[in-house]
A protein has these predicted regions:
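Alpha-helical transmembrane segments of compact multi-pass small-molecule transporters, enriched
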Residues: 42-46, 97-111, 189-193, 218, ...
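Hydrophobic alpha-helical transmembrane segments of multi-pass integral membrane proteins
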Residues: 7-8, 34-49, 69, 122-135, ...
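Hydrophobic/aromatic residues within transmembrane alpha-helices
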Residues: 26, 35, 39, 85, ...
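C-terminal-most transmembrane helix of multi-pass membrane proteins
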Residues: 36, 40, 216-218, 252-314
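Specific transmembrane alpha-helical segments of multi-pass solute transporters/efflux pumps
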Residues: 15, 19-20, 48-98, 108, ...
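Hydrophobic transmembrane alpha-helices of multi-pass small-molecule transport proteins
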Residues: 47, 68, 100, 118-140, ...
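Membrane-interface helix-cap regions at the ends of transmembrane helices
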Residues: 18, 22-25, 29, 43-59, ...
Length: 314
């Protein structure tokens, strides 16, 4: 069993760590929101039809409403904005910024009415983590300008914020009991909203399938099969068979995998500043999650990672 667990965990690291690079290749010749819509519509329909055939109940009308809200926040606001941003900034940088979702979760929980107030350890982790973001994308010492494209940078920051809002909302929303059906319904409803944005932005008018490169088509296929389906299957299996603390390591490893793959396969810059910022950001996430584990331990409750916190799914 240990061998299977490690195989699944390494597969999860590689698959979800590589989705950011796959998005970059996909949006080279496919409009970003159209790409995201196609990815989630196909993946979602496969999951819904599969689980319905397996006997899972279809979502009720109130559940579809909740799934549509989550799809708007996570898939349109989260993945859609990341896809848009990766036309402007490196995939590894996008992954590092999205890796701060646990920081936003703590901050939003602290500020919302009735939310959970952070411990001092969590507050220290927040300060360190957001300091890492500033180091990553802040002004250059030489030019005084931002390290990366401002629009792309702020789009990913907004995506991280919306991911966090969607995650917190999902904890109290009425959702299907089946994690598979929930994910499929979220993808289907989210994809329809993404297509609407794509239509409004005029992506369909300028899109010609003949102009899409083979690299972009293969990247989209990879995102559908591996990023949205195989990766999630591995994740659910790990939750059922491996220690939660081990499964949660995806939040630390995936951004690092994304940075290294981007440098290796797309020749993205890998400067000392990026490496130091990566260490600070990932370290702060570990620090905050350890604080959550300690707090949960005092309350005799395990900290279970939410599916909606999977930033690395891209």
């Amino acid at each position: 069993m240990k061998t299977k667990i490690w195989i699944a965990l390494i597969a999860l690291y590689i698959v979800w760590g590589s989705t950011y690079l796959a998005i970059r290749f996909a949006v080279e010749t496919i409009p970003p929101f159209l790409q995201a819509g196609l990815r989630f519509l196909i993946s979602g329909l496969i999951l819904v039809l599969w689980r319905r055939a397996a006997g899972d109940a279809m979502p009720t009308r109130p559940q579809w409403k909740s799934l549509a809200i989550i799809g708007t926040l996570l898939l349109l606001g989260g993945n859609g904005l990341v896809s848009f941003a990766e036309q402007r900034i490196a995939s590894g940088v996008a992954a590092l910024i999205v890796g701060t979702v646990p920081l936003w979760l703590v901050l939003i929980e602290a500020l919302r009415p009735g939310g959970v107030k952070p411990t001092w350890r969590a507050i220290i982790g927040l300060i360190i983590g957001f300091g890492g973001i500033y180091l990553l994308v802040g002004p250059s010492e030489l030019t005084g300008k931002l390290q990366f494209d401002a629009i792309g940078t702020f789009a990913v920051i907004a995506a991280s914020f919306l991911w966090s809002i969607g995650s917190i909302y999902s904890r109290s929303a009425e959702l299907p009991k089946s994690a598979w059906m929930m994910t499929g319904g979220e993808m289907v409803s989210g994809s329809l909203l993404i297509f609407m944005v794509s239509l409004i932005l005029g992506e369909w008018k300028s899109f010609n399938p003949a102009d899409v490169s083979s690299t972009s088509w293969l990247a989209l296929l990879y995102l559908i099969t591996f990023g949205s389906m195989i990766g999630f299957v591995a994740y659910i299996w790990l939750l059922q068979n491996a220690p939660i603390s081990l499964v949660a390591t995806y939040a630390y490893v995936n951004p690092l995998v994304a940075v290294l793959l981007g440098n290796w396969l797309a020749q993205e810059a890998l400067t000392s500043r990026i490496l130091i910022a990566a260490g600070i950001i990932i370290g702060s996430v570990i620090f905050i999650n350890s604080a959550r584990q300690a707090s949960a331990g005092r309350e005799a409750k395990p900290v279970v990672p939410d599916k909606e916190e999977i930033a690395s799914s891209g």
